[in-house]
Swiss-Prot record:
It is found in: Cytoplasm. It comes from Thermoplasma volcanium (strain ATCC 51530 / DSM 4299 / JCM 9571 / NBRC 15438 / GSS1). It is an enzyme of class 1 (oxidoreductase). Homodecamer. Pentamer of dimers that assemble into a ring structure. This is Peroxiredoxin. The lineage of its organism: Archaea, Methanobacteriati, Thermoplasmatota, Thermoplasmata, Thermoplasmatales. It holds the Pfam family 1-cysPrx_C.
Length: 203
């Protein structure tokens, strides 16, 4: 069954550029799982450099990065070495070698036309629940800043049980859940931060 937003992330044990890993061993941590169409491709190379340049920021947020494509582990190794040689960048996170496409199919990542993995992103919370998923066109590189913003928004919700409004940035107000009864809606009328009975901002 394909991955579903808000449901448990399908578990897997796979070989990677850093050896075997099992997703369930990451329980208790935030995970960013992202797929790319192929090694030695221009857009993917810029993305892996960009992810690496922000790797410390992900680590400070307690987020583990895991890459994925259907290339072999030998292809991953050669690509990592090539990036090191030409850009001076050491890729610090594992890249799954999903040559049998098992994980890619579980996460609905296969482009049926090309047979390659699409440019997907999944944020998995410490309970192994898929909290965010998005697919980018093959021609469009990912915005790392936006991915980090979404992680911070999800962690804000995790910590404070507040939603985030449009264009939210860290440090800005969150939104309390709307009242679920008529009586509680009237009680809210004079509270600080209330714009209307169903919309209350909280710092």
């Amino acid at each position: 069954m394909p991955v579903v937003l808000g449901q448990k992330a399908p578990d897997f044990t796979v070989n990677t550029s850093k050896g075997p890993i099992t997703l369930s061993n990451y329980r208790g941590k935030w995970v960013l799982l992202f797929s790319h169409p192929g090694d030695f491709t221009p857009v993917c190379t810029t993305e892996f450099i960009a992810f690496t340049e922000r790797y410390e920021d992900f680590q400070k947020l307690g987020v583990e990065l895991i890459g994925l494509s259907i290339d072999s582990v030998f292809s991953h190794i050669a690509w990592i070495r090539d990036i090191k040689e030409h850009f001076g960048i050491d890729i610090p996170f594992p890249i799954i070698a999903d040559i049998d496409k098992e994980v890619a199919r579980e996460y609905n990542l296969i482009d049926e036309k090309s047979g390659a993995t699409v440019r997907g992103v999944f944020i998995i919370d410490p309970n192994q629940i898929v909290r965010w998923m998005i697919y980018y066109p093959a021609e469009t590189g990912r915005n790392i800043e936006e991915i980090i913003r979404v992680i911070k928004a999800l962690q804000f919700n995790w910590d404070r049980k507040l939603a985030t409004p449009a264009n939210w940035q860290p440090g800005q107000e969150g939104i309390e859940p709307a009242p679920t009864t008529v009586d509680s809606s009237f009680k809210r009328d004079n509270e600080q931060g209330v714009k209307t009975w169903y919309l209350k901002f909280v710092k």
